[in-house]
Amino acid sequence: MAVSKLPVRSCLIDGEAIVCDENGLAVYELICRHDAGERAVLSAFDLLEPDGKDLRRRPIEKRKELLAQLLNGRKSISFFGEDGEIVFREACKLGCEGIVSKRLGSIYRSGRSPLWLKVKNPNAPTVKREAEEDWGR
């Protein structure tokens, strides 16, 4: 769905442009290719400001609910309320780069927050490459 098709005049969404491989996994190297634009999609994480209404102080659960309504059932990022360790193990089995865990009830803050935790899959190709590059420095 094109952003211009959303039922708002303006909107601030936290998300990431991704390109998926044939298995449906986001692959960093694919977004870097010159022809990525045709295959790139926005993976929306959070709704911050629809039509000028600042939602950043609202709890994450409410922002996710409003994001789902805005996208009207269209695919976005997956949200789970289950135990983070279980979700992480399953994400690793699928070959995902990792997960971001956000504490229920948290408000939106730019930058890093102790209420939001990014956990990387040590076996994901992108993470292995990052580790190798860091080791060489």
Residue ranges, per PLM feature:
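Catalytic cores of nucleic-acid ligases and guanylyltransferases
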Residues: 1-137
